Amino acid sequence: MSAQPVDLQIFGRSLRVNCPPEQRDALNQAAEDLNQRLQDLKERTRVTNTEQLVFIAALNISYELTQEKAKTRDYASSMEQRIRMLQQTIEQALLEQGRISEKPGSKFE
């Protein structure tokens, strides 16, 4: 489906962007989040220049994204390591089971 125009209000300014209908709710939520961040930043920093606030917010969001990407990479690496360890454990168990079942007189059912 094609993108549709969506009107947003961010920090007292109107903005019209095109957005696929299935992403409209996520876009509105992102706009609300950005608006809240800008309001909070204005109160915390006492900066009144809107452009400066937007740049600070963008840097904060970029930093958070970088941190989340690092967490995801670390988690994926940890999972890969665990999978390799499980695979080795299973392979070792299968080898040992093969050795046991090859001994005369041992039967497993």
UniProtKB/Swiss-Prot annotation:
Domain of life where this protein originates: Bacteria
SUPFAM superfamilies in UniProt: Cell division protein ZapA-like
InterPro entries, per database record: Cell_div_ZapA-like, Cell_div_ZapA-like_sf, Cell_div_ZapA_eubact, Cell_div_ZapA_N
BP GO annotations: division septum assembly; FtsZ-dependent cytokinesis; septin ring assembly
Localization, UniProt: Cytoplasm
Subunit text: Homodimer. Interacts with FtsZ.
Function: Activator of cell division through the inhibition of FtsZ GTPase activity, therefore promoting FtsZ assembly into bundles of protofilaments necessary for the formation of the division Z ring. It is recruited early at mid-cell but it is not essential for cell division.
Family membership noted in the UniProt record: Belongs to the ZapA family. Type 1 subfamily.
Annotated PANTHER family: CELL DIVISION PROTEIN ZAPA (PTHR34981:SF1)
Name used for this protein in its record: Cell division protein ZapA
Organism: Klebsiella pneumoniae subsp. pneumoniae (strain ATCC 700721 / MGH 78578)
